Amino acid sequence: MSEHNLKGTNANVPASDSPLADALWAALGTVEDPELRRPITELGMVERAQAVSEDDGGYVADVKILLTIEGCPLKTTIEQDVRKAASTVEGITRVQVEVGAMNADQRSALKSQLKPERTNPFTAPGSLTRVFAVVSGKGGVGKSSMTANLAAAFASRGLAVGIIDADVHGFSIPGLLGVQEAPTRLDDLIIPPAVDAPRERGQVRGGSPGGFVKVISIGMFLKGNQPVAWRGPMLHRALEQFILDVHFGALDILLLDLPPGTGDIAISMSQLLPNAELVLVSTPQHAAVDVAERAGTLSLQTHQKVSGVIENMAAMTLPDGTALEMFGSGGGAQLAQRLSSVLNYPVPLLGSVPLDVSLRTGGDEGTPIVWGDPNSPTSAEIQAIAGKLLHRDESLAGKPLRLNV
């Protein structure tokens, strides 16, 4: 019995004894950690990988994987992916996988590799991540639903998307996206859970597979439906930690779901992410428009750009073809016109999303309508809004960059 070993398997480019060993390593390099979205061979997660000859002339792939933490909920997924990848190597007739966990030193080394310093990656020179803060003047206008569905729309185009649920007192993003996993901790570094855009629907309306949404929310750190009673300084520190201590990796888009109004979080966001573009959500109702205008004009003080207005809960088309204007009409266009006048630059109406029961039920079930019913008129409107937000001629925005730095 002979062995074809990979030596120094915690290095990115290990020494090898044979082409079979090289092929096994290359196959393992196609396996990504589901949260970090990086090859396990780059993350020091492969402790052993060897091809051992058997009496029948075949080879068994003997692999040991180190998970980042004990009791990792993604253990089964990673193990299955490793087995599948190793079994594709020509000459391998059997695969055996041992699963362990990193020790403290290995986790510390991984943390240093992922984020050597506690810095803000979204304001760093050369950052190509577009940052959008989704805001509203008042609650109940569907701001969080729009945030979740915009993220789904971006991901369906093959983009890497992150969401910070900054509505600390009224967090809801994990539920709207069906995210139940808790974040992974590497010392003081937080790895957010991710949800993939459905592959079978990734091609809808010109999209591409491979997109995903990473989510962080204060709700992931609480038991049950526990309320949060925090004031300004605590709210600022929470947002700061989400920005500085959460490892999102390379993102094309970062969305923030802000609480309604112009309070502490809105001010903290402008200080921590001055490059964030504001997207206002309002219903057509004129009372909602008046409040939303105040949220938009705050940008004069924070020196941030308002990229547009989304009118949510617009006219619903009934089975007989008539339109039901539950919340009136024209509010979104009126808001865009008012802000254009006050801010002295064009603020477009990005789109009018109709009142749709499926949007609500999809949120309750944790499946955004953009994924659950991608060919519906509502999904088409949200996709069109996402396309308008991505359009910026002078940048690379909207292109999946996938840079691992």
Protein language model features and the residues they cover:
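Short, hydrophobic beta-strand segments
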Residues: 2-12, 59-69, 132-134, 277-278
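N-proximal, solvent-exposed amphipathic alpha-helical segments enriched in charged/polar residues
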Residues: 2-47
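Extreme N-terminal, non-catalytic leader segments
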Residues: 42-55, 61, 68, 75-136, ...
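C-terminal boundary of histidine-terminating zinc-finger modules
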Residues: 365-378
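Walker A/P-loop phosphate-binding motif and the immediately C-terminal alpha-helix
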Residues: 130-169, 296
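Conserved catalytic-core segment of NTP-binding enzymes
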Residues: 245-248, 252-352, 357-361
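Residue-level signature of catalytic and energy-coupling elements of molecular machines
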Residues: 28, 46, 72, 86, ...
